[in-house]
């Protein structure tokens, strides 16, 4: 995307956008152009200076800039997004409340189920998804759940499989890194 004082152009494969999204972008003053057009647009960019996101610029973009003076910094958009309005705050609160209810129900189920025996990491994942699904606002996972027991909790981005799926016992630690997509927001929770 190239944003200037006068306009904003999103370079994208328009087949990826619905008509509704296209109309919305245009109503916000954002023009659409073919994804591959950004290279030429950067070469033809008339101003002498340009700011690029220091962590998001790839080599092709850097090579297309030419001899312009480039400022590498953090996106001012990210800074603006960090300031939340009341609607966003309420949405986060609703999403976290929904997630909290599911987590409390999971913990209430977990202790007696583990003491009874036969609960695996995959069972914990499935039970949490089941408990979230009771909420009509739940639309799916925000990322794959990590339910890691004992030594598995030390494995970065561990994901149990039917072949490698620890049986829980009433001792030790269970790491739960999970998140849900709700109509009002997205959650990311890590607990032991």
Question: Regions from the language model: what does each represent?
Answer:
Residues 1-192:
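Active-site neighborhoods and metal-handling regions in enzymes and metal-associated proteins
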């Amino acid at each position: 995307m190239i944003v200037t004082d006068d306009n904003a152009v999103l370079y994208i494969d328009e087949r990826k956008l619905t008509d509704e999204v296209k109309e919305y972008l245009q109503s916000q003053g954002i023009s659409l152009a073919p994804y591959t057009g950004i290279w030429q647009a950067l070469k033809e960019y008339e101003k002498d200076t340009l700011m690029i996101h220091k962590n998001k610029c790839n080599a092709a973009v850097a090579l297309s800039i030419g001899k312009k003076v480039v400022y590498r910094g953090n996106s001012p958009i990210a800074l603006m997004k960090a300031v939340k309005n009341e609607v966003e705050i309420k949405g986060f609160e609703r999403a976290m409340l929904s997630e909290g209810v599911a987590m409390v129900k999971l913990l209430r189920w977990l202790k007696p189920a583990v003491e009874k025996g036969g609960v695996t990491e995959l069972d914990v994942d499935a039970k949490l998804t089941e408990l979230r699904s009771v909420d009509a606002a739940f639309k799916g996972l925000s990322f794959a759940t990590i339910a890691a027991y004992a030594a598995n909790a030390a494995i970065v981005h561990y994901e149990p499989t039917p072949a490698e799926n620890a049986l829980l016992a009433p001792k030790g630690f269970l790491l739960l890194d999970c998140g849900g997509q709700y109509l009002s927001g997205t959650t990311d929770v890590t607990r032991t």
